[in-house]
């Protein structure tokens, strides 16, 4: 049986388009089985982006169930580790793909009665990781609503569109900013009740501010202590930028450029709310040795992740005082990367 990482590796090795990758994964799952938990993947090439989801076929079956939806060219799709695919119009081959057993397994397992309209997420997932019977969580809602406020999406809905057309064009910097989101200044801000009184040195008056020690990445012990002192002090919300993240990336696929420079992965390690991103071109064949060393499960000075992690953990201690410095450094490195990327791309384009 395949795990999701193995399927990803084989698809990347053997396929040149997103559609080819989806078909190959489907064939491998049908023949050899899928033994991992439910997963969703974004599978993209320079011309298309697809949202792909896969589940096992059952405890006594070697196989799997999967479905895929193409994100329209002018849309943005979001899935944060939950099933998002709803109805499947398999007659529309330009937009939808699915395993042959997608409906039969749902009926056999009692997930769908065959009478009500079939919804993939409802049959194979039933809800999000908070136990809510929804095809989204706060993360999907926040991003989709931020990009298309004109749609007036409701958090009380059972499901949201798998993708939306943004109210204005989305740049790579916009995606980076969304991946840094902690809901600061919104109703979901986990630090909004963590206030302290401070005396203004100039006016001698007392102001109430968010505590410098407050941060959106507080652990369970801290949250339990604060809520133990006063119930309801902090409502835990799943952030877009989570501190347990090992790495994240924003990938640009530009079909008007040669492959070697048309693809760029903007990579960062550790907490995406604090870490700057660096550009890695698809034509890159080598990186500094520290990038090839795994420091995920233990401290290693020679692993790049620990350079990020150390700075982030220290900054978090008094985030209210260090936030501006960290954000300024992130902006500096990302702006430097963006300007140098544009220059490098122009330098490497063939001349006529």
Language-model-derived ranges and their functions:
Residues 2-33, 135-211, 215-216:
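Alpha/propeptide regions of enzymes that mature by internal proteolysis
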Residues 52-54, 211-215, 219-223:
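Soluble extracytoplasmic regions of secretory-pathway and membrane proteins
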């Amino acid at each position: 049986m395949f795990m999701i990482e193995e399927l990803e590796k084989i698809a990347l090795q053997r396929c040149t388009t997103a559609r080819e990758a989806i078909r190959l994964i489907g064939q491998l799952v049908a023949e050899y089985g899928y033994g991992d938990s439910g997963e969703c993947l974004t599978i993209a090439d320079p011309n298309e982006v697809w949202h792909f989801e896969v589940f096992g076929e059952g405890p006594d079956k070697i196989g799997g169930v999967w479905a895929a939806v193409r994100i329209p060219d002018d849309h943005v799709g979001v899935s944060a580790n939950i099933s998002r695919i709803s109805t499947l119009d398999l007659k529309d081959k330009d937009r939808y793909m699915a395993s042959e057993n997608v409906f039969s397994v749902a009926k056999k397992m009692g997930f769908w009665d065959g009478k009500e309209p079939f919804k993939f997420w409802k049959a194979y997932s039933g809800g999000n990781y908070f136990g809510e019977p929804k095809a989204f969580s706060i993360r999907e809602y926040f991003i989709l609503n931020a990009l298309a406020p004109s749609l007036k999406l409701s958090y009380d809905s059972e499901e949201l569109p798998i993708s939306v057309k943004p109210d204005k064009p989305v740049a790579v910097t916009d995606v980076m900013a969304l991946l840094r989101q902690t809901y600061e200044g919104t109703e979901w801000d986990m630090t909004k009740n963590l206030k302290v009184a401070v005396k203004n040195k100039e006016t001698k008056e007392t102001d109430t501010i968010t505590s410098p020690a407050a941060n959106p990445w507080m652990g369970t012990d801290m949250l339990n202590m604060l809520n133990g002192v006063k119930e309801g002090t902090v409502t835990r919300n799943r952030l877009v930028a989570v501190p347990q993240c090992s790495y994240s990336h924003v990938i640009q696929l530009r079909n008007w450029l040669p492959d070697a420079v048309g693809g760029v992965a903007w990579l960062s390690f550790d907490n995406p709310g604090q870490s700057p991103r660096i550009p890695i071109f698809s034509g890159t064949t080598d990186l500094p040795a520290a990038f090839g060393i795994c420091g995920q499960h233990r401290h290693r000075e020679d692993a790049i992740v620990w350079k990020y992690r150390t700075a982030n953990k220290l900054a978090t201690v008094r985030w209210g005082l260090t936030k501006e410095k960290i954000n300024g450094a992130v902006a500096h490195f990302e702006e430097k990367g963006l300007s140098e990327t544009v220059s490098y791309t122009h330098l490497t384009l063939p001349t006529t």
